[in-house]
Amino acid sequence: MSWQAYVDDHLMCDIEGHEGHRLTAAAIVGHDGSVWAQSATFPQFKPEEMNGIMTDFNEPGHLAPTGLHLGGTKYMVIQGEAGAVIRGKKGSGGITIKKTGQALVFGIYEEPVTPGQCNMVAERLGDYLLEQGL
């Protein structure tokens, strides 16, 4: 299966039990900032934004004072899982980033999708990739 198929079929799919509800954008990005696959709606990000995200995984709390920036959008960092998951909120939407051994799985949402649904979608694929040694 191609990386694009993982994004299309496992991240940008209808949320289980909520037909028509799906993430706004999603991507799988290597730890080095290289995009493995992304939805057409995923924002163009700057290298320094990806560096900040990677630093927060290695030094949890790094982004809390300044917020998480992706594609020029600022998200307030909310409770995540140190070294494993970063979650952010902006207005009626937000972001979940799950770290695997080699990649970051991004899910971005807006209402009516809930934070919990975004977490479930992004983290489920991230957990699967971890199980595969990726």
Swiss-Prot record:
It is found in: Cytoplasm, Cytoskeleton. GO terms for cellular component: cell cortex; cytoskeleton. It comes from the Eukaryota. One of its GO terms (molecular function) is actin monomer binding. The modification Phosphothreonine is found at residue 114. Disulfide bonds join 13-118. Keywords: Actin-binding, Allergen, Cytoplasm, Cytoskeleton, Disulfide bond, Phosphoprotein. The keyword Cytoplasm applies. PANTHER family: PROFILIN, PROFILIN-5. The variability of the residues taking part of IgE-binding epitopes might be responsible of the difference in cross-reactivity among olive pollen cultivars, and between distantly related pollen species, leading to a variable range of allergy reactions among atopic patients. Occurs in many kinds of cells as a complex with monomeric actin in a 1:1 ratio. Belongs to the profilin family. This is Profilin-3. It comes from Olea europaea. The lineage of its organism: Eukaryota, Viridiplantae, Streptophyta, Embryophyta, Tracheophyta.
